[in-house]
Amino acid sequence: MGESNTAAPPSRSRSLSASIKGLFGKNSISSNEINGKKEAFVQSGTREDQRYNEEHHLKKIDTKASVPKKDTQLSPLSAPGSYLKKSTSIASSLHLNSGKQSVTSSRAQSISSDGNGFLSQESFISEEHEDDIDDTTYYDKSTRGFTNLSKEVESYSISRKNSIQQSRKASVDDNEVDKRNAHFPDSDTTIDSVLGDKNKNQKVMNQINSISNISRSGSVPANPPILSSKSRRGSNAMSIRSPSVRSTASIVSGNSNSEVITPSSKPATQNISEDGNIKKTDNTLKCVINSKHFKVYENGFHEHHLPVIDLVKGDSTDSLNSSTVSKGTEGIEINRQKSSFSLTGIFKKKNGDKMNELLDTEPFGNASSLMPTKAFCPRYKTKDGSMIEEPLEQETTHKKIPKIVNPYAAVGSEELKLITTLSDKIKKGLKNKDGQSRSGSQSGSASSSLHTSPVASSTSLSSKFHHALVTCSEKYGDPVGVIGHGTYGVVRVCSRPLLISDSAPFPSYCNDKKLFFAIKVLKPKDDEQLEKFSTRVTSEFIIGHSLSRRHKAHALQNKVCPSKRLAHKAQRKLDWECPNILRVIDLMETNNTFIEVMELCPAGDLHSLLVSRSQSGNAIGSLHPLEADCFMKQLLRGVQYMHDHGIAHCDLKPENLLFHPNGLLKICDFGTSSVFQTAWEKHVHFQNGVIGSEPYVAPEVFQLGKDYDPRLIDCWSCGIVYCTMVFGQYLWKIAIENKDSLYASFISQMKDENQFSLFEELRHVNADLNKLRKNVLYNMFQTNPEKRITVDKILHSSWMKHTRCCVSYNHSV
């Protein structure tokens, strides 16, 4: 390891295909053997450069507002408990810099060249965090727990009278406290009731901590039963699970390891009838925040109701969660609302006449898959209900590939073979300008599937679906409309009837009658080189496809260490399939046209959501802080998953964040992603060159000739995206001091005052949570990347640990 400590990590081309070329040369440092000596595997999160021999240390930030003077040199993320002993009142409104560019204006121009489970909501405290994080390093035990909503937050209109009375009563009657359900205290107005109030005694807090440990130990976190006040006071049960919900999870999911997504967190008792339908009782809780598309209840649970595009609205009400819709089961329904959302992150809107013209003049129903038969591993169900993939057979004729040293990498030997296969087929298809559809003519082509049941209507595919040739219209249905266009083509929505042979989890959005898919039609530009187009299409598809399917833990384990079992945490990393990555399903071709089949997210993207909020009465187009926190946690989870598997997105922005109606966030558009570590590499490869969309690009990217860690530019972009959600505006247009006055102001304030006025003016529903959030933002916006906080540490921060998210992740951070 000596060489890695004296030289900076090597940089590589952003192109996946270019990176693969020469990967296994004699002089390549990516080989797992250097000078005949084997080296230990280094995880993707470990920096080999001497600059990163030590872990990131959070920079101490002076947050003068609301902080005792003697502690102003300490950051709440690393400060002693006295830092948080006092809290000031929260202002009732946000003070924004009117000089910033509004998000409702024209979008940022790109500067690049080219679970299913059942209803649940993640706890305020992340799973297993006691083993990894000692909260006493952030605040003192005597002040553990956050205050309830401030009286001065008039916009939320929440009275604390009943909560205070209940708190006083709890301090007098200890027996009453023991009988109380700690997750749902008898309060009519508490948002952060899980954490309690500072006025509550330590016994209550210990009780809450013990219950939190129970909740994190389960494989499927379930929505606890909501009882009336009398029932809660008279009950001795401390369980936070509903037996009916837990039993249903195993029936619906068919995969005990899959993540649990909460289509709706309505705090009502839910029972499952004999026919599989959900029956809700009248024991509902009070809704304390009730906006058009976002609701928060007094127990802290929340739900999203994002409108869907008209194209997917049929005769039946859309399901909030496509994964839970199958024969005999139903998701919770929402009222249908009109929406003008589109996939603006990939394609821009086009007028209706041109869209219809494109729809009529570019048929692709006879397109056939370019995916080879062995490109997909058949999935099968184990005895415990988990889904695993059958390992691929090794081709003896293929060039010898070095031993895998990084089992977490998304790009491995199978992806390498797939790159070669697809590149050859794309080039052949482009050269054959006058050729017809290749359905039936390509011996290596075959349909593909990510689940055990066939998706084609032909009954002959029921047993050997992956050996038959199926056209696009048979597999994914007929086009029902165009939702946008871009430089390289158009995107359509296709739908087909939901068949009895279809089983959850479905590969894309589904209502109770149809499956919907997003079809991205790609054509080379007139002046584009064939090699360049082939590389672009192949790289984008391979990265998205490899991230959106479960990795083969058993096969990789045998390659890395046949005689030993992987550690439990490492095994979960291999098995985990992130719900926040857009599924890339198939790549097809017909008549010099290439078709990328993707999961449809019918609620549009974050940019459209912000614009719609601005148009519906919200002057700045911002989101509620609790709503923004939920989306931020999902974004960080998705980015963490990408980084764990050796890929950095490099172009995170609102346009590339799509939604399902239930608020499930999906990261899309991997065309500019960087593969910084493959399965054969021990080292993290740095990157150089400008890439991304200007308002979201980190400052080190603009330093020409210097290499940078692509993971840290993703972290910076996440911070910009969050600020866009809470401010409704860009922080600045470009992070170059002499080109943008707003960024120059940020640099000046941080140097002179060690704080930024906009961050100091941010407000939340809870004063202590606001401080924790503010200090994480300061560490995300470190202009020196070596001092910048990582995505992993953000997820381990107290802000994220105490952020409710509508996705419950079985995989711990």
Swiss-Prot record:
GO terms for biological process: intracellular monoatomic cation homeostasis; positive regulation of endocytosis; protein localization. PROSITE patterns: PROTEIN_KINASE_DOM, PROTEIN_KINASE_ST. GO terms for cellular component: cytosol; plasma membrane. SMART domains: S_TKc (SM00220). Residues 157-169, 226-274 have a biased composition (Polar residues). Residues 477-800 form the Protein kinase domain. Keywords: ATP-binding, Kinase, Nucleotide-binding, Serine/threonine-protein kinase, Transferase. Pfam families: Pkinase. One of its GO terms (molecular function) is protein serine/threonine kinase activity. Residues 206-219, 437-455 have a biased composition (Low complexity). InterPro entries: Kinase-like_dom_sf, Prot_kinase_dom, Ser/Thr_kinase_AS. Its EC number is 2.7.11.1. It catalyses: L-seryl-[protein] + ATP = O-phospho-L-seryl-[protein] + ADP + H(+); L-threonyl-[protein] + ATP = O-phospho-L-threonyl-[protein] + ADP + H(+). The active site is at residue 651. ATP binds at residues 483-491, 520. Residues 35-72, 177-186 have a biased composition (Basic and acidic residues). It comes from the Eukaryota. Belongs to the protein kinase superfamily. CAMK Ser/Thr protein kinase family. NPR/HAL subfamily. HAL5 sub-subfamily. Protein kinase involved in salt tolerance and pH sensitivity, probably by regulating plasma membrane potential and cation influx. Positively controls the TRK1 potassium transport system in response to potassium starvation. Stabilizes plasma membrane nutrient transporters in the plasma membrane by preventing their vacuolar sorting and degradation. This is Serine/threonine-protein kinase HAL5. It comes from Candida glabrata (strain ATCC 2001 / BCRC 20586 / JCM 3761 / NBRC 0622 / NRRL Y-65 / CBS 138).
